[in-house]
Amino acid sequence: LPTPAPDDEGAILVATADGKGVPLVRADAQQVPAFDKKERPGNRRMATLGCVYSVDRFVRTPEQIVSALFRDAAESQPEDRPEARFKHYRAFFADAGEDGCDAVPSAYSTWAWMAEEVAARHQSGQPIVRLMDGQLSLWDAAEACLSDFVETLLVADPTQLVVDILDIVHVSSYAWKAAKALYGHKEHQEAFVEDRLLRILRGEVLGVVKGMRRIATQQGLKGEKLKAVTTACNYFENNASRMR
């Protein structure tokens, strides 16, 4: 795809990636090693989909973000949400490698392409946002592929912003799992999730984690319920730097 004209780009440059299961036709499915098939139910092969786009700023309060997630019409939303510009997509499967070389994970192939896109489209002073879920391999690939370009930018301009953001939709899914483990009634679950998401969006993620662990201890959770809360707490803790 051609590189967009700088004057047509938005104020922020966003790079995002996610793993996707791709259904295989029979001929391709037969090429998947037998030992690998159990991890790909339904004859699916994992690919990493990457997208680079630009967008103008859209300022919202934590309350507005949470109300949008809950589809709460009582909370007014800003009008005229800016549209993403020049969404460039590309997806990669893992490269099996040749001549005894190790396989190249799909996340690295995707981020290598995305790094080229970012380098070609970035404008002086334009903030770069890396937006993903908490999958460690994606963040490792982003760091490996984009770090040299970012370091060059920071040498030229120490004020250059590179912001890592954890996708709030994935955050909310972990909060819901914890809520269902802690409370039996739906209204209590909703109140818990709404409160914790608000606090996370206000930068209080470590306080949220501490409180969730305390409640789990007070309730004496065990088994799958304790596992759900512990998994959510670990997810939030491991990604706290991306939820500031």
Q: Which stretches of residues belong to each language-model region?
A:
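Catalytic center-proximal scaffold of phosphoryl-transfer enzymes
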Residues: 1-244
